[in-house]
Swiss-Prot record:
GO terms for molecular function: 4 iron, 4 sulfur cluster binding; iron ion binding; NADH:ubiquinone reductase (non-electrogenic) activity; quinone binding. Keywords: 4Fe-4S, Cell inner membrane, Cell membrane, Iron, Iron-sulfur, Membrane, Metal-binding, NAD, Quinone, Repeat, Translocase, Ubiquinone. It comes from Roseobacter denitrificans (strain ATCC 33942 / OCh 114) (Erythrobacter sp. (strain OCh 114)). One of its GO terms (biological process) is aerobic respiration. This is NADH-quinone oxidoreductase subunit I. Belongs to the complex I 23 kDa subunit family. NDH-1 shuttles electrons from NADH, via FMN and iron-sulfur (Fe-S) centers, to quinones in the respiratory chain. The immediate electron acceptor for the enzyme in this species is believed to be ubiquinone. Couples the redox reaction to proton translocation (for every two electrons transferred, four hydrogen ions are translocated across the cytoplasmic membrane), and thus conserves the redox energy in a proton gradient. The gene is nuoI. The lineage of its organism: Bacteria, Pseudomonadati, Pseudomonadota, Alphaproteobacteria, Rhodobacterales. It is found in: Cell inner membrane. It is a peripheral membrane protein.
């Protein structure tokens, strides 16, 4: 005669595994949500976030870039192209500053190499395009990005200053 395992039969007939699963499901059903409804809700960004590139200006309106070409030299993807000419006062300024965003790997080396904080990676990460040509940024577009995001860029650089 075989011995019957009553605990195993009780678990089977009382649907214990089912109720354990239902309890777990109800626990997560009423718990706070871990995800955001992205297009309508946005999460916080770190001050060190590396998004869309921008060229900055001084408060008097003059461009910060001194055409040292350190960012071009340090770029591992070779995404930056700079041409410069001397000005009447003897300083150099860029005549061409292009970034090929299809090559850029968002490493931040250009931002770290810049001695005057001219090139920065701003807080904007929503810059999808319909054509590849729109991802070739010229100097005018980079300066426009800098003007658009200057307040937030300056605040982020100030918050990051103790760690530089």
């Amino acid at each position: 005669m075989t011995q019957v395992d009553y605990t195993r039969a009780a678990k089977y007939f009382l649907l214990q595994d089912f109720w354990v699963g239902m309890k777990l499901g109800m626990k997560y059903f009423f718990a706070p949500k871990a995800t955001l409804n992205y297009p309508h809700e946005k999460g916080p960004l770190s001050p060190r976030f590396r998004g869309e590139h921008a060229l900055r200006r001084y408060p008097n309106g003059e461009e910060r870039c001194i055409a040292c070409k350190l960012c071009e030299a340090v770029c591992p993807a070779q995404a930056i192209t700079i041409d410069a000419e001397p000005r009447d006062d003897g300083s150099r300024r860029t005549t061409r500053y292009d970034i090929d965003m299809t090559k850029c790997i968002y490493c931040g080396f250009c931002e770290e190499a810049c001695p005057v904080d001219a090139i920065v990676e701003g807080p904007n990460f929503e810059f999808s395009t319909e054509t590849r040509e729109e991802l070739y940024y010229d100097k005018d577009r980079l300066l426009a990005n800098g003007e658009r995001w200057e307040a937030e860029i300056a605040r982020n650089l100030e918050m990051d200053a103790p760690y530089r």
